[in-house]
UniProtKB/Swiss-Prot annotation:
<protein>
    <recommendedName>
        <fullName>Bifunctional purine biosynthesis protein PurH</fullName>
        <ecNumber>2.1.2.3</ecNumber>
        <ecNumber>3.5.4.10</ecNumber>
    </recommendedName>
</protein>
<keyword id="KW-0658">Purine biosynthesis</keyword>
<dbReference type="InterPro" id="IPR002695">
    <property type="entry name" value="PurH-like"/>
</dbReference>
<keyword id="KW-0808">Transferase</keyword>
<dbReference type="Pfam" id="PF01808">
    <property type="entry name" value="AICARFT_IMPCHas"/>
</dbReference>
<comment type="pathway">
    <text>Purine metabolism; IMP biosynthesis via de novo pathway; 5-formamido-1-(5-phospho-D-ribosyl)imidazole-4-carboxamide from 5-amino-1-(5-phospho-D-ribosyl)imidazole-4-carboxamide (10-formyl THF route): step 1/1.</text>
</comment>
<keyword id="KW-0378">Hydrolase</keyword>
<comment type="pathway">
    <text>Purine metabolism; IMP biosynthesis via de novo pathway; IMP from 5-formamido-1-(5-phospho-D-ribosyl)imidazole-4-carboxamide: step 1/1.</text>
</comment>
<dbReference type="GO" id="GO:0003937">
    <property type="term" value="F:IMP cyclohydrolase activity"/>
</dbReference>
<dbReference type="InterPro" id="IPR024051">
    <property type="entry name" value="AICAR_Tfase_dup_dom_sf"/>
</dbReference>
<dbReference type="GO" id="GO:0006189">
    <property type="term" value="P:'de novo' IMP biosynthetic process"/>
</dbReference>
<keyword id="KW-0511">Multifunctional enzyme</keyword>
<dbReference type="InterPro" id="IPR016193">
    <property type="entry name" value="Cytidine_deaminase-like"/>
</dbReference>
<dbReference type="Pfam" id="PF02142">
    <property type="entry name" value="MGS"/>
</dbReference>
<comment type="similarity">
    <text>Belongs to the PurH family.</text>
</comment>
<dbReference type="GO" id="GO:0005829">
    <property type="term" value="C:cytosol"/>
</dbReference>
<dbReference type="InterPro" id="IPR011607">
    <property type="entry name" value="MGS-like_dom"/>
</dbReference>
């Protein structure tokens, strides 16, 4: 059994990231801790006027091979691995003194290889060998040794030393050990991922296969969830080790109940949809489908228009905005409807103050960022489906007019708006829109024509006029019936990928009804 509290008398410091190094070293020296170090770390400590002993002096071997061999020595690893109450005699026989604390971070392999111009030689030179070996030795022997791998750990480590007269608890040593093994796993995964993706080792800057032979993923637990998708399922939320700026995983929860699995799934759909728009926009999501989307003069205007699409489905929904949410809009929302989650890049003080009146509402702030996920994944039985993320946009210049009548300028704007919304509606997806707002949404049907009929039904239920609206379809129409249904509802223009064997029949149907139609050449299935 590990002793609960053990003193720190001797520490080895070897870091690539010098953040906080001198303050840590100074605090350890003040506690009469003997410092051992290597290379640039020893130089920095010495230049700060602090006593430090080079590892080369300890081992009797100089650093060699351009620093590739520094710490791979029994006097180092024996000092880290020696077990209290078991190995003292062996250590004494071979002149091995115990090392109680290892402070080490690794060569910056990840930050070097993320650069597009990184050469294979640069990558290889930043593969740390001695560092991971020492981390594993120290972490394995947590019964006696403490190990710190991140400058963010220094303050807590020093606080515990201060509170316990220079000693660290077994709980602290174990927690640091787990963090060290996690760091080594992350580091090795990054090396494996990079080398597995190298298509040709003969290239100076090697081409990287986007789908390498092996993938090693690292996710960090953010929180436990009340349950999974259903109450009988357990759940938790993990984020990428290096989250992409502006994506959902970077959220801050400002108030409200704990988040659920479904809250986060819906929030992601809402946030990804709303961040497509430059003008103030509101997206209301229910069961991962947008049920109302609008662009307006401000957040309040956008909300009113989005809500009007489907007030029934908006109840208990997730609301996302792409601009700072003002107090008046927050009041209008919370006085009118039950909301599960509010999302915005920021909030006026008045909006946050009013939200406290509805303490259970989860309020998320996601700082602005233009980052996009590079990949989408989906678990299947004992496997993983992986694809490049659907980050494909669409501009007016990419549209092909295929009908006798071309869309008007106003219709073109609405077509692009509806196309952006359809991208986030479950297939088969049909979106009716007019004046940069949704009129009706048909989602998740096995038949495309049924989705079109549902969109019209939703508009009718909301007492919205379809006549003069446009329609977006996430995939091609296999038959003309979808166009016929749209025409009977009053649709004037259609945007769709095209590519059906019966495109000619579909185009002819549009011409019969005087409907303008454009092809995108891009499909947006969403399952």
């Amino acid at each position: 059994m590990a002793s609960d509290f053990l003193p720190v008398r001797r520490a080895l410091l070897s870091v690539s990231d010098k953040t906080g190094l001198i303050d840590l070293a100074r605090a350890l020296v003040a506690r009469n801790v003997e410092l051992l170090s290597t290379g640039g770390t020893a130089k920095a400590i010495r230049e700060a006027g602090l006593p430090v002993k080079d590892v080369a002096e300890l081992t009797g071997f100089p650093e060699m091979m351009d620093g590739r061999v520094k710490t791979l020595h029994p006097l180092v690893h024996g000092g880290l691995l020696g077990r209290a109450g078991i190995d003292e005699a062996v250590m004494a026989e071979h002149g091995i003194a115990p090392i109680d604390l290892l402070v080490l971070n690794l060569y910056p392999f990840e930050s070097v290889t993320v650069k597009t111009d990184c050469t294979l030689a640069d990558a290889v030179e930043n593969i740390d060998i001695g560092g991971p070996a020492m981390l594993r030795s120290a972490a394995k022997n947590f019964a006696r040794v403490a190990v710190a791998t991140d400058p963010a750990q220094y303050a807590d480590l020093l606080a515990e030393l201060e509170a316990n007269n220079g000693q660290l608890s077994a709980a602290k040593r174990f927690a640091l050990s787990v963090a060290a093994f996690n760091r080594v796993a992350q580091y090795d995964a990054a090396i494996s991922n990079y080398l597995s993706a190298v298509a040709d080792s003969a290239e100076t800057v090697p081409t990287r296969n986007p789908f390498p032979a092996q993938i090693n993923s690292n996710f960090v637990k953010v929180m436990d969830l009340r349950y999974g998708e259903n109450p009988h399922q357990s759940g938790a939320f993990y984020r990428d080790l290096y989250p992409v700026p502006g994506t959902l995983a970077t959220f801050q929860q400002l108030q409200g109940k704990e988040l659920s699995y479904n809250n986060l799934a819906d929030a992601d759909a809402a946030w990804e949809c709303v961040r497509q728009f430059d003008a103030p926009a509101c997206v209301i999501v229910k069961h991962a489908n947008p049920c109302g989307v609008a662009v307006g003069a401000g957040c309040g205007d956008a909300y009113e228009l989005a809500y009007a699409t489907d007030p029934t489905s908006a109840f208990g929904g997730i609301l996302a905005f792409n601009k700072t949410l003002d107090a008046a809009t927050a009041k209008a929302i919370l006085d009118r409807q039950f909301v599960e989650v509010l999302i915005a890049p920021d909030y006026d003080a008045g909006a946050l103050e009013y939200a406290t009146k509805k303490a259970n509402v989860r309020v998320l702030k996601i700082p602005h960022g233009n980052g996009l996920n590079n990949y989408d994944t989906k678990r299947i039985g004992s496997g993983l489906l992986m694809q490049s993320a659907d980050n494909r946009g669409m501009s007016l210049g990419e549209l092909s007019v295929v009908t006798q009548r071309a869309p008007s300028e106003a219709e073109l704007g609405d077509l692009l708006f509806a196309w952006r919304v359809a991208k986030y509606v479950k297939s088969n997806a049909i979106v009716y829109a007019k004046d940069s707002r949704t009129i009706g949404v048909g989602a998740g049907q096995m038949s495309r024509v049924v989705s079109a009929k549902i969109a019209a039904l939703k508009a009718e239920e909301a007492k919205l006029t379809v006549a003069g609206s446009v329609m977006a379809s996430d995939a091609f129409f296999p038959f003309r019936d979808g166009i016929d249904a749209a025409a009977s509802a009053g649709i004037q223009a259609v945007i769709q990928p095209g590519g059906s064997m019966r495109d000619g029949e579909v185009i002819a149907a549009a011409d019969e009804h005087g409907i303008a139609m454009v092809f995108t050449g891009v499909r947006h299935f969403r399952h």
